[in-house]
Amino acid sequence: MGTRKKVHAFVRVKPTDDFAHEMIRYGDDKRSIDIHLKKDIRRGVVNNQQTDWSFKLDGVLHDASQDLVYETVAKDVVSQALDGYNGTIMCYGQTGAGKTYTMMGATENYKHRGILPRALQQVFRMIEERPTHAITVRVSYLEIYNESLFDLLSTLPYVGPSVTPMTIVENPQGVFIKGLSVHLTSQEEDAFSLLFEGETNRIIASHTMNKNSSRSHCIFTIYLEAHSRTLSEEKYITSKINLVDLAGSERLGKSGSEGQVLKEATYINKSLSFLEQAIIALGDQKRDHIPFRQCKLTHALKDSLGGNCNMVLVTNIYGEAAQLEETLSSLRFASRMKLVTTEPAINEKYDAERMVKNLEKELALLKQELAIHDSLTNRTFVTYDPMDEIQIAEINSQVRRYLEGTLDEIDIISLRQIKEVFNQFRVVLSQQEQEVESTLRRKYTLIDRNDFAAISAIQKAGLVDVDGHLVGEPEGQNFGLGVAPFSTKPGKKAKSKKTFKEPLSSLARKEGASSPVNGKDLDYVSTSKTQLVPSSKDGDVKDMLSRDRETSSIEPLPSDSPKEELRPIRPDTPPSKPVAFEEFKNEQGSEINRIFKENKSILNERRKRASETTQHINAIKREIDVTKEALNFQKSLREKQGKYENKGLMIIDEEEFLLILKLKDLKKQYRSEYQDLRDLRAEIQYCQHLVDQCRHRLLMEFDIWYNESFVIPEDMQMALKPGGSIRPGMVPVNRIVSLGEDDQDKFSQLQQRVLPEGPDSISFYNAKVKIEQKHNYLKTMMGLQQAHRK
């Protein structure tokens, strides 16, 4: 199928002894029905009342048996459902017109069974006729009563009580009822049992038109899923058949319903009105929006109304003259339904598990064909399985030899081998870059050229001038001492005495800690972006330092140990971190502290501007509201006065025109200010990130400075001084501290070695150590935060 087709609409007339032959006539083709009314004499001579109607339908079922109704209406829909097409059969009409009889029939007599039992019977008979397919049948029974959803099969013992109320949910696969139970049936008898169980739970009431009137809409759904038994295809088909028994419409003034029946009739008429609105919208090809969500009935039937299914409508009418108005209303609904078009399509799905199995079989077959092809071309040594570690190592060796020049070419064997060769090229190049970087780190201290704080620090230390050249850099090849540039300024003596680690120790801290090469500030080692500072043990600098020491030894000294006088006396106990932090901000961390304060001031300024802009926006919004009220007042005043031209155009006075212009300007200004506010918020977020980054950097460098200044043992201080054997900043602090550990530290290490003998105590001691470390960390951070607030 796949082409668009119109909905089939049939009319079934309820048998009666008082049939209005003069008013209701059928066409000879049994596809049309004509209605004729006599003019009302009470309306006088001039009477334009319509008296004749003609309706073209797909069939008129008058005095038709249940067998004929099913053969005409439902048999093709059910048959095509087993081929993968969805189907919907709906019964519509006024109260007592025979809708439930058409759908369900009389359960007391087998011959009088309706469309629904016959559809179940046909489904299972067709399943028996298709032994090549494994077809699964599931059913559900939904009731819509007073705009509430109920599961008619919830009373079964194996169906648990619903905790949450049922709701209608949409997904890419369609519309389904969340909370509605779906029951698997393997036999026709089981399906009938479920049908009768649901029928006993339906809400019925006595009515003037029908003793057992259905007071709710009911939807019985049959879900089908067919898999092929013979073919190993992963594709299977699904379908569903919606059998809808609508509640009957009625004229409240005519039926005289009261109490609960009146309330039910109100809900029924309301939902049927929304259904008719949806049908009218579906019949109009120019409509973009279909009001499916106006009521539960139309929402639940969204897939059935105008979807990809075969749809049939059975309109039940009275043949009596007293019910002619309701008959006309039902026939109008049927004619509108015929304008709706659907596009039936097969619902095909794919079984993931079977698809995997088929792909595995196909892969094995392709491997066999490839092996035959390789054997015919004398390539028996080629394998297409995933490579193991030995093969990958061999390819890595080939790539290295190719880069070194000892291998001229790499033989191409397979596509998998080519991909692995490119992968190993990436691995080898990455390893070479890491080796070059580690070599540079061992020989040089790397400083990022974009790290202005580190550059400023080494300029203050006197090692690099403002142009980025090393101080004392040789200008010629014949003399090694060189001449310092004139722009280089010597450090003050007082400052060098106060900070006994200047210049090299502070330089190392700012090079190694403040701008770590393995951090985010230096992602790639490059000579174009990085300043290389030779260490004290390299080449000319080492000679220069040795000559400086020889020169200084000739000069007279005031004492036998001048180095001891230059080094200040270290306090027995280190100062508190808040005090040390203030000293650090004024000296070694002054540059970072300055940047931190600048960023913070910029952040505060942006926040102030954002606050002012917000206040301005609020003021504009208030003015817009006032202008709107004034404009609405002018409009209402103009409408009351009725100022119109001859052509029907409205006349706007000058005051209203000025208000419109003012409102337009205010809205434009509001949008502009709001855009500025969004930009300011983005700047605030960026500035906040910079402030947090500077704060973290300041605290981190202070921690390193504090550890190097007061925690490292004194014997290690001598090694870290200029001219010592170890350059400061190159050895981690925890390794340096461990060199001067006391007996308690040695006992802790001994305890860690002895612990494996008693495994039960490992968790206890490890937890204790972690808690102590956590408390120490929190204590330190609280002290730093208090110092920062000051």
UniProtKB/Swiss-Prot annotation:
Essential for normal male fertility and for progressive motility of spermatozoa. InterPro entries: KIF6/9_C, Kinesin-like_fam, Kinesin_motor_CS, Kinesin_motor_dom, Kinesin_motor_dom_sf, P-loop_NTPase. Residues 6-340 form the Kinesin motor domain. GO terms for cellular component: cytoplasm; kinesin complex; microtubule; podosome; sperm flagellum; vesicle. The modification Phosphoserine is found at S546. This is Kinesin-like protein KIF9. One of its GO terms (molecular function) is identical protein binding. Residues 342-380, 658-690 form a coiled coil. Residues 537-552, 561-570 have a biased composition (Basic and acidic residues). Residues 525-534 have a biased composition (Polar residues). It is found in: Cytoplasm, Cytoskeleton; Cell projection, Cilium, Flagellum; Cytoplasm, Cytoskeleton, Flagellum axoneme. Keywords: ATP-binding, Cell projection, Cilium, Coiled coil, Cytoplasm, Cytoskeleton, Flagellum, Microtubule, Motor protein, Nucleotide-binding, Phosphoprotein. Belongs to the TRAFAC class myosin-kinesin ATPase superfamily. Kinesin family. One of its GO terms (biological process) is extracellular matrix disassembly. Its main location: cytoplasm. ATP binds at R12, V13, K14, G93, Q94, T95, G96, A97, G98, K99, T100. It holds the Pfam family KIF9.
